[in-house]
């Protein structure tokens, strides 16, 4: 059984971040070590919420506790998702280095949560810059949506060919795999939910019917991808 250290958000009402990812990852056969970057009452798409952003040092202290009992060498992957602050990102990269020192085969899966194709960049100041400058080159796998792909590549992405080219530009900076988790307007059809997985040599495209969920779209599905 693979052990995944999942460092991302948590909501009490509903499901997002770790509260969305933990169950499906366990069902896929992974052992999840959830470490929350924020504890919110609900997802921010509701427009109002309560809760707190965890101090960056809290993340490091928790992981050090795992190291102190000799378990960090058994960590097979680190997943990072929603960040409450750019400072958290710096500590997460330190955790990635610590895990890889204990287990050189461990992978870093970065879900660079920054925005939404219809809403733009919606994260705390400095988070987008952190992902572009530091998380991208440190990651083994990175999973942007369309707007995040544009932010990371610094190019407009208008179609699938553009997306493949932008993904390959990211690969040249560090990651082995780029998973575009939602092509949105750059996909082949506005009636499909389309995804793209790109390596230096190959690219795979997959789609499914686009289901209309109304004003609040489901969130958190991509948070479980490291288990696959």
From Swiss-Prot:
- List residues binding substrate: 9
Q: Which reaction does it catalyse?
A: pyridoxal + ATP = pyridoxal 5'-phosphate + ADP + H(+)
- What's the top EC group for this one? transferase
The record's EC number reads: 2.7.1.35
Q: Which domain of life is it from?
A: Bacteria
Concerning Gene3D superfamilies, the annotation shows: 3.40.1190.20
A single GO molecular function, which one? ATP binding
Please list the residues that bind ATP: 111, 143, 148, 181, 208-211
Quaternary structure annotation from Swiss-Prot or TrEMBL = Homodimer.
Statement: the UniProt record of this protein carries the keyword Membrane:
no
Q: Which UniProt keywords apply?
A: ATP-binding, Kinase, Magnesium, Nucleotide-binding, Transferase
| Protein's UniProt name | Putative pyridoxal kinase PdxY
List GO BP terms, alphabetically.
pyridoxal 5'-phosphate salvage
What does the sequence similarity comment in the record state about its family?
A: Belongs to the pyridoxine kinase family. PdxY subfamily.
Q: Which sequence ranges form a coiled-coil region, renumbered to this chain?
A: none
Question: Which gene produces this protein?
Answer: pdxY
* Keyword flag Nucleus: no
Instruction: Give the protein's biological function.
Output: Pyridoxal kinase involved in the salvage pathway of pyridoxal 5'-phosphate (PLP). Catalyzes the phosphorylation of pyridoxal to PLP.
**One Pfam family per UniProt:** Phos_pyr_kin
Pathway annotation: Cofactor metabolism; pyridoxal 5'-phosphate salvage; pyridoxal 5'-phosphate from pyridoxal: step 1/1
GO CC, any one term:
cytosol
Cofactor section: Mg(2+)
Region (Substrate) location: 44-45
InterPro entries named in the record: PM/HMP-P_kinase-1, PyrdxlKinase, Ribokinase-like
